[in-house]
A protein has these predicted regions:
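Short, conserved active-site loop motifs that form the nucleotide-linked donor/cofactor pocket
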Residues: 21, 102, 169
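Glycine-rich phosphate/nucleotide-binding loop
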Residues: 77-90, 94-104, 182-211
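Short glycine-rich anion-binding loops that position phosphate/pyrophosphate groups of nucleotides
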Residues: 28-29, 68-70, 78, 145-148, ...
């Protein structure tokens, strides 16, 4: 970001200077109305673009962003690429429940997905649950409007068939909205449109509960 702005904010927040903290200059600003592609192609001197460049050049291990989600995803896709055999990136959100934390994937990266993309989401979500949440054999559920196999739209029905036959996925079947907060599986798979609605609804319910 802009060094002068960052240093001023650090002073206001009483954050001390440290040799472990390096400010990397970046002077362009990604507006929330920018498209993700325009933000990456036209604003190469933005903080998100510079941050992803640092990971690409092995000068950083990870990027944390509270800004434009589309720009962060697009920059990562263009500069870092995806894992082998993964066609599209996905956003994984760690969600709470009464019993345990679980992975929601996709939480908004791809509003329009094909069944194969959701299977890839299940594989990525399972890997995250296994290595980060410590679940030995993560249980995977598919978000639908009913637990029966015949329930759901065309995307859900075809995805369900693929999940049942894909090695490496511990698929437990379809789940419904009320399952999310009581006893959800370790990984909940859905398209980005549905996942983003779930995420935003959860945020609003939390805000209401605090009032």
């Amino acid at each position: 970001g802009v060094p002068e702005v960052i240093e001023r904010e650090m002073q206001q927040q009483a954050i001390p200077q440290s040799p472990k903290l390096e400010i990397v200059p970046a002077y362009q600003v990604v507006d929330m109305n920018d498209s993700g592609l325009d933000a990456v192609r036209k604003k190469k001197d933005s903080s998100i673009s510079r941050a992803v460049d640092l990971v690409k050049d092995r000068m950083a291990d990870a990027v944390v962003s509270a800004g434009h989600t589309g720009a962060a995803v697009t920059a990562s896709l263009i500069k870092l690429r995806t894992l082998p055999h993964i066609e599209r990136p996905a956003i994984a959100a760690i969600m709470p429940s009464r019993s345990h934390h679980w992975v929601l994937i996709d939480a908004g990266a791809n509003p329009d997905s094909l069944p194969g993309h959701l299977v890839q989401n299940a594989l990525m979500g399972s890997a995250y649950a296994r290595h980060v949440l410590g679940r030995d054999n993560p249980r995977v559920g598919l978000m639908s409007n009913g637990t029966e196999e015949e329930k759901g739209n065309a995307l859900c029905k075809e995805t369900s068939k693929l999940l049942r036959t894909t090695p490496g996925i511990n698929f437990i079947g379809n789940i419904e909205g009320h399952d999310l907060w009581e006893t959800p599986p370790d990984v909940v798979v859905c398209d980005g449109f549905t996942g983003n609605i779930i995420l935003k609804m959860a945020e609003s319910l939390y805000d209401i509960s605090r009032e």
